Amino acid sequence: MLILVGSKVIRVGGSFVKSNGQCNCLVRLFAAQIPSPPVAESQFQNEWDKALPYEKIPGPSRLTLIKDSLPGGKLATLNLGEVLEQYRHQYGNIYKISGGFGTPDTLFVFDPKDFETIYRTEGIWPFRPVLETVEHYRKKVRPDTFYSGGLGVEQGKEWAEFRTTVNPIMMQPKFVKLYIPQIDQFVDEFIIRMRKIRDSNIYELPENFEEEMDRWSLGATCLVALDSRLEIFGELDKNSREYELTAALKRFIYLRSVLDLKPSMWKVFPTADFKEMMRVLDVITDFSFHHVNEAKKRLESKVNTKSEKEQSVFEKLIRINPKTAVIMATDMFTAGVDTTSSAAISVLYNLAKNPDKQEILRNELRKILPEKGSPLTQQNMSNLPYLRASIKESLRVLPVVNGNSRKTGKDLVLKGYRIPKGTLVLLQSLYTQVDEKLYTGGKKFMPERWLKNQESELSKEARKVSPFTFLPFGFGPRMCIGRRLAELEIEVFVSKLVRNFYIEWDQPDLKFKTVGINVPDGKLQFKVKDVEN
């Protein structure tokens, strides 16, 4: 296939990729995601003519949804994930919630074949809905700080230009792996903290352990986002920047769900929640800006003796533009801390519920960590198939998000209905990735299905399933920019904890709720008993 990029023609799927310098990174990023050859125009027109009109797609109105969600309504006691599942049973694998109150229609799809169709036709500048409060803050309240809305706000050409700038830095495993020693040491400190806060008689962690997990994730993120080591465990001075940041991030998660994920009047007049959100974003932004300025002074005061490959992610970003570093830091705080924490919790929970799998992983880790305090390195982390299979399986069974979202890049026909270009679609993979028809023991935690060097029926089956069934970090040009960092943080965290502790769960099954992402809905009372050696 030949496509035009800038002023030059390039071959995709062949042996070369060429373009001018500005677009070259974008070409490399998008080349592997170029859609399959399109259906012949006449064939598509025939499908379109036979399809039912968009208006015939079943589903509730926005007003009905609001009414049913009020106290006493049939949806009042359900979380968002349960509501979507109930509608799926009622309407099938495609339905829409009609727009209203300034919001567009939202189409929900549940079939991996439809996921693939949408992704394959999204174009090189995919449109993904943004948090409008964050967009308002960056473009209306603090445009002096944010020369760009960043990856979480921008669309089209502006998004592509910013992604082109940061992608070679954020998505390169070799750059992220430079942080293994620092993250390893930080997890060692967290293990000391866990031993201190657990019950000395029954080895049970406190009910608020989720807050400790959030602090671990925040601290690990700061190592990369700001080249800063936070003293974040234990009691924090309420006047400290660290305390203000942790409090702000906690409120951000709540306010995001109230203002951006539910109907709100903030666009009509500034509600109390909206005003608080602006203050919260000020705290997060000012924290990032402070550390960027401090780092800039440090870099300017000393001769740079590091080669490019030795420079940290943060150093690379700040040398491009200090404001770019601020944008990426705030994005990592608002989009990465809670998701990484929740993902790590789900891995611990699945391993605790499956002690036989936990022991297999521990035996794998003993080979590279002969002592409980042995450090992780780039070299000894290079071959840990069961660790990575365990993390992947946990993200399948207990995903951090219900799916992904896009606006359709062209007119489509899905499930016999006409879907106009520009329709907002939510791709609900939460249900397909545990479907018993696709995965044997779909809801069971079985990491063996992802071991590439095995020829078990489980692994053979997993290889046959469409990859669009399960995409925990998204797909294509708008794939999660923090994927490499999140994977590394979780790998180091799980490795060190499993090598040090027998992780147990003797409570009722842990439930999760949807607040934009899926988070634990209950107390995290893990038991952690020391491994002898």
Where do the model's predicted regions map?
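N-terminal membrane-proximal hinge/A-helix region immediately C-terminal to the signal-anchor transmembrane segment
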Residues: 11-14, 23-26, 30-144, 157, ...
